[in-house]
Amino acid sequence: LRAYMTPRVASRDTGRRPEYRRGMTAPYRVVAVSGSLHEPSKTTALVGAITAAIAERADIESQLIELTQIGPGLAGALQRDQLPPEVEAQLQAIESADLLIVGSPVYRASFTGLFKHLFDFVGQYDLVGKPVLLAATGGGEKHALIIEHQLRPLFAFFQALTLPLGVYASNTDFDGYEITSEVLEARIALAAERALPLVGYAASRPVELLVG
């Protein structure tokens, strides 16, 4: 089992953020999932920025799963054993991650259908106690509640540890596909800071104690 990450807090007058050290343990496995059906994508840019913020604060190995890449092999499968090997490998990465960063554009008032189809194949108990950072993009602020009304209930079914602070971005936060909003950048940084202690806690707990 991994040891709990202990923050080393800098003195107040330095203005430096806490640094997380993990000793001799392996890097945390961070898997980001973009539910966008387009490339390039604001959603992919957002989950990438969140992953980068985590990487600035902890030792990680990251992987990005894009539905634009695996969608054709995913869409036609009705059972998990019908999935092509490359999609099965992505599912195993999701199930074995220490932290999931999941994001979807708002599509017909919810996440994309292929995003849901992907998680329909995830084992019912394979995300128990797993930290999940929720993110979404939409055309305006009126769609921001997708995180609370759509994404959070989905991962509550899996008994995942959804982080209280989600990250929503609208079109005005981007110039093309580049994040330009200082407010959004600050929220990404705050989400990363708050995620790390929970990732360390979850990684130190035997999953057998969490399944019930």
Residue ranges of each PLM-predicted region?
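Short, glycine-/small-residue-rich phosphate/pyrophosphate-handling segment
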Residues: 132-170, 183-186
